[in-house]
């Protein structure tokens, strides 16, 4: 006869359950989910629990959880709500024994069973907990990543019921997907906090090192100011027949655009690319070619866009100093303007406005009465001159020293003005600034002593000091003529121009714009050769700054100088003299603010060494009062 089932509460059944639990405790180190089981037991608070021979909570905890398999959905039995406790997980349905499905109630109820266990149960669980803590001290939890196992880990049938399709084969699992308890998360956060603390310490060390090395950076930056790019940027030859090309794609290649324009319309002489505004200016040899090119290039397909083209306007009225690289042709050239342009290194002071001024020969009609011209030879109380500076740094240095030096061809006019007039006012402007820097009064004659000469333009742009434009030749093809790329990246200029005819050398005597650009090219070449005229020396004289308040060119719109072909005052060269009434009107736009802030009196025993190496007194020349803020 088979053994009859034992009545409830018998000691034999309790002994059988205890033996099964002892076997399970000895084998739990090989159990794939031992760490999670021990963690669950550690996290259980002491509370109300049920103990008895039919308590299957311990067996239920040994079953695998659906979250240990990828893609497994959590299942809730008997309509129980999903688990909201981070420590307790819903138990899956097991097959093979109906007693496992006869436990109603939420899963949280069965997690609190530790308090009601017999002493021998509790001792074995404490032993497993200690082993689990030893494993947690290592780099990773025991058997935390099931993806390390090629085959599923199996246990004896006395501990696991046969599983159906509810638990598929193991697959690749996401990292840290098995550890849902707070202990691995806390351990991970400890490592993160440790790395974050190290990073903060490293950042603080970097800040300290930066503060210590800051004076060296400032010193290097101060030394690099001596290699300032001087002079205006190079510009292509201006034929007076130009079109504007817009809607260029970003980062347009210059030669790709030149090839496209030459293919669509022949007769291109130069193309100036403005990358910042995605546009370009193209010069053509005559008006007919210019009009034809505008019609063909407009709405033409370039790469992936449609280009927009317009004819260039034939006037420079209303310009604010930042003019386009192309301009209208000269209808009545002025010979006196072209004669002022010297073919030496001093021609680098020609500004953008100067080149446009040389082509704008036909002055617009003046609706208001023109100012009465004063005879320059007649004695005058006041004289006004426009002086150009290569850089703003030279002007700021002059504020500190009260010394200025001009070009040689201006010295005679300034000396004569100082002798005949009561006051000589000098209005300063830096190249490419689009504004007046300020104005000062001449307080001494120009020192004719050769020993006092200073090098106000150090070595006249020697190739070793500044970056000069790079000329890159280009070969001709079926559409494009032979030419060259002028890359002046230091000044933000790049353009292409066709080579001029060999018989004319690219200079037309009747085109003052072309002559000015040609002279500018000669000056750059003379700087490269480093000939005897490469050093530009100036003789110093004393000035008293009256205002360093900046005056933009647009504020002087409408003020014209009768002594400069009635052009606007902003269109002037270095040394241009203003008609006295115009000079008074222009200086009246300045204010006296800013002189006291920028003016710094040097120590009486301190001497400045000028560019030519000649020691100059730091203060004023003996016999002249020091400068004061007006």
UniProtKB/Swiss-Prot annotation:
Region Disordered: which residues? Answer: 38-113, 160-183, 200-241
Give residue spans, biased composition: Polar residues. 70-102
Tagged with keyword Transcription regulation: no
Q: Name one GO cellular component term.
A: nucleoplasm
Any one Gene Ontology BP term: mRNA splicing, via spliceosome
InterPro entries to which the protein is assigned, alphabetical: Nucleotide-bd_a/b_plait_sf, RBD_domain_sf, RRM_dom, YTH_domain, YTH_prot
Question: What is its biological role?
Answer: Specifically recognizes and binds N6-methyladenosine (m6A)-containing mRNAs, and regulates their stability. M6A is a modification present at internal sites of mRNAs and some non-coding RNAs and plays a role in mRNA stability and processing. Plays a role in pathogenicity towards plant host.
| Name used for this protein in its record | YTH domain-containing family protein 1
Q: Which gene encodes it?
A: YTH1
